[in-house]
Amino acid sequence: MSKRIVTIVGARPQFIKAAAISREIKKYTDIEEIIIHTGQHFDKNMSDVFFDELEIPKPKYFLDIHSSSHSQMTGKMLAGIEDVLLQEKPDIVLVYGDTNSTLAGALASSKMHIPIAHVEAGLRSFNKKMPEEINRVLTDHVSNLLFCPTKQAVRNLKAEGITSGVYHVGDIMCDATVFANNYISKNLDRFVNQFDLKSGDFALMTIHRQESTNDEETFNELMSYAKKFSEKNNLKIFFPVHPRIKKLIQKYKEKNNFYFLDPLSYFETQYLLSKASFVLTDSGGLQKEAYFHRVPCITLRSETEWIETLESGWNRLWTVDSYNSRKPIIDYGLGYGAKSIVEILSNRL
């Protein structure tokens, strides 16, 4: 009889991470994976093509829960996920990262005494005002298997008294980047024709976090910083526009150094990232992906959970004027994190 894993995701970055593990799960004939999409972030780019390109199945369940307060969203997700878990009766629940979907999946499973596996466990920004930080901490403290991307994440858990079920497996975003690079190589003409650009003459910029966009003054400070940065370094700014900031960018549309783009697919983002001179972002994931492509990053936040990128000199906070001396390698693994995770899951099921 096959063992059953329920995977809970709610945002595009979580699908990218889950895809790496789903591709490994498919190699096991005795494991069945069922995917729940909470709907936390609706993304029009997540069509059938999105799942085909990532080589993963479409979600069996779509809860369509989004666009409400953190508490309302998490509460609705708890109820919706519980209904699915009662029906599917999984042997283990797999959650990713630090979204409301992560926390809701972990809490629902914990209350039903279903084992929980948390991918990207142990990360800490130590900023309790970030909703993601609360989600990370609470999820870790109810999880049974904690898959850490870094040794620092393992140390963070130990400092909180969590030592059982902790595994240092490397960063599965490294797995995802290897997969993306192979995909881009096979479809290179498509990307070259789509983007008329010269390598190195632009910076890739993204802003999407609520703390960056809810306050117009903060957003304007970030845009002013980016403008000065581009002028100082003689770089264009390629800026895919998140739906949250469409109104905020109107007064910048006539600025010659900003090139506003429609939202990009995952593979389009990876292609532009590989050609950029710099990355400016408030995204945690893009900080790492910049490193995987060996592109210097400036994080548009006052802290980051990926402290290795700061210590290694590949990343710096926008409030700091200089990088640390650059080291060639960060211990994020070699792209086999998903394989290690599924082997551990298989042995525990």
Segment roles from a protein language model:
Residues 3-11, 15-24, 50, 62-161:
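Active-site and donor-binding regions of nucleotide-sugar-utilizing enzymes
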Residues 40, 48, 185-275:
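Donor-nucleotide binding loops and adjacent catalytic segments primarily
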Residues 51, 152, 316-349:
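Leloir-type glycosyltransferase catalytic cores
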Residues 63-64, 148, 167, 260-262, ...:
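Short acidic-hydrophobic, aromatic-tinged amphipathic segments that line or gate anion-handling sites
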